[in-house]
């Protein structure tokens, strides 16, 4: 019995142990599972956060790239719009000038037609008067002949002589009327032919008429370069203006720097200098001087290329090299506000077309028209520029007709051929375009600035003189070895007094003396 009880107790204990172990194991399994789940959830949250962070960073990167690309496209669009607006304004201005020119031509044609009608009426009235007079004379002559025939007491020789005299008088009257009629018809025909030739020449040739200004625009890659161009405390701008004699204007216009100077050649040199500095990426006073020296060497090639281009456009390929270089210099001179090279090209084309209409040598007419103002780019002379140009072209064995056309286009000598009249007429047409005479004021301002520079150059020790800010400042560069500081003060005073006595100007003019002393030594 005790054994049975013990067995039952053992079985019961085993059963209790099994149940307890089951529940204890289940508890620990649930505890471990909960921990794993929590760790997994934390890991999932961490992965989600990292993914969100990477997504945000990627989003910010793409947004930044899109913004930069949008800003770039916007700048390009604004620049393109600015260029197109400027081009549209220029085309609109050209169209207005062309319309004004056509209106003037139409008015001239109407005036000529009205004048011809008036002359035709006068001729008809004169013709009627002459006819009445001729009828009256015939009647008188017939009556006189009848009287002579009826007179019997005259000698036969006397009567015959009287009849002959009357017949001669009648023949002379008829001949005079015929000559007068032929002369009037010839004048009318010549007038119509001249008008037709001029109208044909003007209609066949279209020109871009723009008044030369004193500004050049240089485009830069970004506005950040403006700060480098200005330099610390503006030292780069000062060095640039001292080297080139050109005002440099840096304003709020995007990606644009403006150069201002009345001298086109000096302005072109400054433009080449600035482009070299921007290409090198190094901008400081020493680099500016070096770039200006390099640009000075290259400007001759630019000038010669301009002469070659205009000669080729007119198909004049036999012009001497020395003359080609002078034609290139015309690009940097103005006449009544118009570019001198463009003006000469217009005269050449007009003269060529009119010569072709009149069955004359069109090639020689174009050559004479292109070279007619060559004297304006030669060294100054006491003679008129037309005579100076004619004398210069003599050494190239040009024809007498061409030389006379050059020398006579301003009436300084007698015209000896139709070619001279054609060049004179073409020159007058080119200069009488709309707005040409209004540019005389601009030429006067340029001459005033040149005279200010010449006044300052007349003093000893002066190397260079530049008229800046539309003539409100004269900047004088002197030799540092020959002019001391005290002498520089006196020089500024003397130049100012001479300007007051010899020049006419509004307001006041600032005279700046720049004296630089450089000492160089070499260590060996």
From Swiss-Prot:
Annotated membrane topology: Single-pass membrane protein
Does the record's keyword annotation contain Transmembrane helix? yes
First-level EC class: hydrolase
What residue stretches are annotated with the HD domain? 340-432
Q: Where is the KH domain?
A: 214-280
One annotated GO molecular function is: RNA endonuclease activity
Q: Where in the cell is it found?
A: Cell membrane
Q: What is its main location?
A: membrane
Answer whether the UniProt record assigns the keyword Disulfide bond to this protein: no
Q: What is its EC number?
A: 3.1.-.-
Keywords attached to this Swiss-Prot or TrEMBL record, sorted alphabetically, are:
Cell membrane, Endonuclease, Hydrolase, Membrane, Nuclease, RNA-binding, Transmembrane, Transmembrane helix
Q: What does this protein do?
A: Endoribonuclease that initiates mRNA decay.
* Family (UniProt): Belongs to the RNase Y family.
Q: By what name is this protein known?
A: Ribonuclease Y
Please report the organism this UniProt entry assigns to the protein. Answer: Chlorobium chlorochromatii (strain CaD3)
The opening ranks of the lineage are:
Bacteria, Pseudomonadati, Chlorobiota, Chlorobiia, Chlorobiales
